Amino acid sequence: MGLGVKSTTEGNATFLAVAGGYVWDKSKDETHPQYNTQEYKKIDDSVGVRAGARYDNLTGEIVGVRFNQHEKYGESVLVTVASGGEKFIISIGTNNRYSQDMLKALLKMNFSKPIFINPYDFTDKVKNKRVQGISFKQDGEKINLRNDDAPFKEASFWKEANKKQIKRFFEDLTEWFTTTVTEKVIDVYFADGDVEATEKVAPKVVAKVEEIADEMPEVSENDLDDQLGALLG
């Protein structure tokens, strides 16, 4: 693959981020064949640029899950994926849409089988809304991310609630998912850290060729208010 990067804290692993509908290895520079840049609009309407090796998706076996608390950046979920003899650590802040889909998937997937991880971020032309998240497949079938036990609000809540109430709901929802993933996934499968992959999978980190036509505002991974503002307009 040529994606491995030596980490002083995680051994031989590649740290990956999910942003703008892609998987990014931000440690790579212009010399890497998959190097690319992507502009995004910040919350203050200024334009930022993310850069690094850019990929469409990642296929592999989940061999580790843990939560990490950072003094500056807050809580994140770290998901270790084994693929073709290499390890990739996907790091996502727990208060963004990508992490919600990741946490939902962790409660539904089979950890003994490889999984296809495909982020997306585009504009629904009909509804004129941003559509953002991650889709997952196992055995060629899309994983249904619906978790019936998760906190739920009726349609009337979304019509009448103010931003503070919605913010509180998402905070409660995030807490439910992090607690449930800890109890049902980490404590059960990864209590002692990363495990060995049970199946060798040919690495599939695919570069997306086409550019995103519409650049959407970037959602801060560190501020739920930013997330809600982007979702609610």
Where do the language-model regions lie?
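Acidic, gly/ser/pro-rich intrinsically disordered tails
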Residues: 1-15, 164-233
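Short, glycine/acidic-rich beta->alpha junctions
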Residues: 98
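OB-fold ssDNA-binding interfaces and closely related basic DNA-contact patches used
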Residues: 1-91, 101-107, 122-171, 175, ...
